[in-house]
Regions:
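Exposed, interaction-prone extracellular/peripheral surfaces
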Residues: 1-32, 38, 51-56, 65, ...
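A positional/architectural concept
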Residues: 39-43
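Acidic, metal-associated active-site segment
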Residues: 48
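N-terminal juxtadomain amphipathic helix
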Residues: 58-60
């Protein structure tokens, strides 16, 4: 399984110019596809007054301006059309595992970068929380190229492998406190930890939440290596895995399928939109297809 070593891989900062170009279609799909409705109904804001016209709602009359001008004026409001995006990214030890060529975290990092550049292209504010066994980094949503570079610089940093565990539940709760307006939230994780569902319920009651599960072929199939020692990266539990055993292979494959089904059911039950992406897939292709759909469920 892969570790978190990025040797030989260009950083997101180094790839910024190319990513800006490749995410234009993704940005358009985000703005016009599944989440188009989120650009509407974010609230209304006062934009000025104009003279009353026949048919206007009399409840909109601005009586102060009308009194000063001796002509009836009505208040004009405009709908906010700004979509705010927030990324909750898992950097725990289990995210350092993956395929031979790419870890789960490297896949998550690419997904986060693509969404960040799509947000920049649409002038959408974007922020993030990074976590492992503790909250590592918090950035409130802002818009513009400088914000993009700040986020990418943190996505590029090597995860701290000294910190065990995962505080996804705390990250979800913290995001709910940070976000002051309805937002599109992406939770990017392998979701191996427990006790995150209650926090998802609360977050999804105020925001639109997409749960992005980073999978890997090793979730279902392991190479035949005989009996090998295995240490769970999250809890440190050690066990022997007989990878040549047919019964073990069958059990491993079925457990992987059941975990995926439980996660999918849990997301839907608690208000999240499930999206699975494998370390072997192209994140841009998967995200473009996801955003271009008129319905996500």
């Amino acid at each position: 399984m892969a570790d978190s070593n990025n040797t030989g891989r260009a950083s997101l900062i180094q790839r910024a110019a190319l990513l800006r170009i490749t995410t234009k279609t993704l940005a358009n799909n985000l703005q016009n596809g599944s989440f188009k409705s989120l650009y509407h109904g974010q609230g209304i804001e006062f934009s000025g007054v104009r003279e009353y016209l026949r048919g206007d709602d009399v409840r909109a009359i601005d009586w102060n301006v009308t009194a000063r001008s001796a002509k009836p004026y009505v208040k004009v409001f405009e709908e906010e059309r700004e979509l705010q995006i927030f990324l909750i990214i898992d950097r725990s030890l289990s995210m350092q595992t993956g395929s031979r060529y790419k870890s789960r975290y490297q896949t998550a990092m690419e997904i986060a970068a693509l969404i960040t550049f799509a947000a920049e292209h649409n002038a959408n504010p974007v922020g993030s929380v990074l976590f492992n066994g503790e909250i590592e980094f918090v950035c409130e949503p802002k818009s513009g190229p400088n914000q993009t570079m700040i986020l990418l610089s943190h996505f590029d940093k090597e995860p701290d492998n000294r910190v065990k565990g995962s505080v996804l539940g705390n990250a979800l709760t913290g995001a709910g406190k940070i976000l002051k307006k309805r937002s599109l939230v992406f939770v990017i994780s392998d979701f191996r930890m427990r006790d995150w569902e209650a926090s998802l319920v609360h977050l999804a009651s105020h925001h639109d939440v997409v749960c992005v599960r980073i999978g890997d072929p090793s979730d279902y199939e392991l190479p035949e290596m005989g009996s090998v020692p295995f240490t769970d990266p999250e809890n440190g539990i050690k066990k022997i895995m007989p990878t040549n055993s047919k019964s073990f292979k069958d059990s491993w494959r079925e457990d992987g399928r059941m975990r995926l089904q439980r996660w999918t059911d849990g997301c839907l039950k608690h208000g999240g939109v499930p999206l699975k992406i494998s370390t072997t897939e192209d994140p841009l292709t998967v995200l473009s297809s996801f955003f271009s759909k008129r319905e996500v469920l």
